């Protein structure tokens, strides 16, 4: 098996394709969460805290001579922590739902397989032979 055919077999496996789709959706979901936190969650929190504008939260260290001032923008850190919490919670809820579905599938009793016509015929023959042996 050549290198190219091995790569093709690897690339089209279901797990690799599923993983790629998951990464793409995850990246898009991350952008949605970032916008949600920055544009929807942070402004009301700032209002509740007392009119704090989170976009301006930073600590500026003094400049020394020709060296410009260093800005520690902790607003971005707070927003990133909130992004992480929201994404982690969404993943937790998704995993919890999947686990519940797996448990329901495991609990549901499976019906016994329907015997084939050949099995049914053999069972009838066996029963007839037993009945003949019991008569003699």
UniProtKB/Swiss-Prot annotation:
- Which segments cross the bilayer? 17-45, 74-93
**Per the record, what is one GO cellular component?**
plasma membrane
* Superkingdom of source: Bacteria
Cellular compartment(s): Cell inner membrane
Q: Which residues lie on this side of the membrane: Cytoplasmic?
A: 1-16, 94-136
Q: Which GO terms describe its molecular function?
A: mechanosensitive monoatomic ion channel activity
Extracellular side stretches:
46-73
- Topologically, how does it sit relative to the membrane? Multi-pass membrane protein
* SUPFAM superfamilies, sorted: Gated mechanosensitive channel
One Pfam family from the record = MscL
Entry's InterPro entries? Mechanosensitive_channel_CS, MS_channel, MSC/AndL, MscL_channel
Q: Could you tell me the keywords of this UniProt record?
A: Cell inner membrane, Cell membrane, Ion channel, Ion transport, Membrane, Transmembrane, Transmembrane helix, Transport
Ubl conjugation as UniProt keyword: no
Subunit info here reads: Homopentamer.
What's this protein's family per the entry? Belongs to the MscL family.
Question: Its biological function?
Answer: Channel that opens in response to stretch forces in the membrane lipid bilayer. Forms a nonselective ion channel with a conductance of about 4 nanosiemens. May participate in the regulation of osmotic pressure changes within the cell.
User: What's the protein here called?
Assistant: Large-conductance mechanosensitive channel
Q: Which organism is it from?
A: Pseudomonas fluorescens
Upper classification of the organism: Bacteria, Pseudomonadati, Pseudomonadota, Gammaproteobacteria, Pseudomonadales
Gene of this entry:
mscL
């Amino acid at each position: 098996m050549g290198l190219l055919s091995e790569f093709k077999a690897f690339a089209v496996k279901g797990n690799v394709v599923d993983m790629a789709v998951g990464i793409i959706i995850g990246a898009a979901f991350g952008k949605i969460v970032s916008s949600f936190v920055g544009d929807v969650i942070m402004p009301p929190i700032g209002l509740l805290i007392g009119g704090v504008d989170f976009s301006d939260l930073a600590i500026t260290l003094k400049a020394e001579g020709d060296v410009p001032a260093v800005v520690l923008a902790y607003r971005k850190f707070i927003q990133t922590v909130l992004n992480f919490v929201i994404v982690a919670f969404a993943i937790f809820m998704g995993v919890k739902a999947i686990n519940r579905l797996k448990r329901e599938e495991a609990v549901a009793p499976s019906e016994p397989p329907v015997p084939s016509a050949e099995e049914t015929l053999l069972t009838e023959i066996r029963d007839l032979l037993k009945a003949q042996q019991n008569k003699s």
